[in-house]
Regions:
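Soluble non-transmembrane domains of integral membrane proteins
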Residues: 1-247
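Helix-loop-helix
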Residues: 100-101, 112-135, 205, 210-364
Length: 364
């Protein structure tokens, strides 16, 4: 019943000529899967992600003209409880509806919990210049709740058992983030949920949510609707899926500046239809926006250059009297209406903007 392979048919894998990007995968040297199951009063009394599931659907692919593909699986009954999982794949969407139905085939009421989790190995996928101190993309878990907002939880924090994130809420989602792509478990309906992050054997990390299913009487069925997103970090689409989901796109500390830059880049691309030209035009617009600052800086530097002989002469004549030298220099600056830092300040103001632009290009 686990999702063990998800291949992005419209995205090529970096460094693999002719190969598609594979997000979920379970094989030698790599583990990245989506799992769900039940937790009962005692171990082994309800189906888990380890329980064998049987495919009930006959359709395996989305037919021409069909908008949705429904794939239904049912677990073997465990302790009189059966878990039926229905995946609904929609054409043109990376968001999959996952309906979880708990059937009580026993003679006594049960009240299990449903868990959904993302499990992957701790291999970091960093993208960015191979230069010390250069920004690198984030790989690891992230949580979101309306109260605590977006919370990154690096693998090393989980190892040290000092990961800080909201442990329970009435809304929110959990994700695994890597460069360009993400996977997310969502429970759209408001309701109590618990969040967890743990280190498993074999350098594996599991992050997920727990939901109460409620009392299920004998012969009754309880349903929990969840969703699984597995795909690229397309910001404009992610924001429509769930609150805060666009935040999985990592802009580092430049977030406030990077967001409007990406918005502008996105709309320029819509006009010209080419990302390369969109980037060129964005840089031209930024240079035009900063033209006044740059002109001011160049004028200030030109004035400082013209004053340089007088300043040098002053330093030579008053080198034994630093205080008077400083006073005379400030007098010259006032008389000539020159700001000694006027050539640097306009440039310094622009630096955060272009760092933010770097993050936009790195993340997009």
């Amino acid at each position: 019943g686990s999702v063990v392979r998800a291949e992005m048919l419209q995205h090529r894998a970096s460094g693999e000529a002719g190969g598609n990007m594979v997000l979920f995968e379970r094989g030698e040297g790599k583990t990245y899967v989506a799992q769900s199951g039940l937790i009962g009063q005692t171990a082994g009394d309800v189906p888990t992600h380890l329980t064998p599931f049987k495919l009930l659907s006959t359709e395996r692919s989305l037919a021409e003209g069909q908008d949705a593909l429904v794939v239904k699986l049912a677990s073997e009954p465990v302790g009189g409880v059966q878990l039926v999982r229905t995946y609904t794949f929609k054409r043109g969407s990376y968001l999959v509806d996952v309906r979880q139905e708990v059937l009580n085939q026993g003679t006594a009421a049960v009240a299990p919990q449903l868990y959904v989790q993302l499990v992957r190995d701790g291999t970091l996928i960093h993208e960015g210049p191979d230069v010390w101190g250069a920004p690198q993309s984030y790989t690891g878990p992230a949580f979101y709740t309306t109260e605590a907002k977006f919370q990154k939880v690096p693998f090393e924090k989980i190892d040290k058992k000092d990961a800080e994130f909201q442990k329970s809420a009435s809304d929110g989602w959990v994700s695994m983030v890597q460069h360009y792509f993400t996977s997310v478990w969502l429970h759209p309906a408001a309701g109590a949920r618990e969040f967890f992050a743990r280190h498993q054997a074999g350098n594996l990390y599991a992050v997920g949510m727990l939901f109460p299913v409620g009392d299920v009487a004998p012969g009754a069925t309880s349903t929990v609707d969840t969703q699984l997103y597995m795909g690229p970090q397309e910001e404009m689409k992610l924001k429509d899926v769930s609150e805060g989901l666009e935040l999985v796109k990592d802009y580092g500390w430049t977030h406030l500046l990077a967001k409007p830059l990406f918005w502008l880049l996105f709309h320029i691309h819509n006009l010209v239809g080419n990302w390369g030209w969109a980037i060129v035009l964005l840089v031209v617009l930024l240079k035009a926006a900063f033209y006044g600052l740059n002109a001011s800086a160049y004028r200030s530097m030109a004035k400082m250059k013209a004053l340089n002989p007088r300043i040098q002469a002053l330093r030579e004549s008053l080198k034994d009297n630093p205080q008077q030298m400083q006073q005379e220099m400030m007098k010259i600056y006032r008389e000539e209406k020159v700001n000694p830092i006027g050539g640097c300040l306009p440039i310094l103001i622009q630096i955060p903007v272009f760092i933010a632009l770097y993050w936009v290009l790195l993340s997009s």
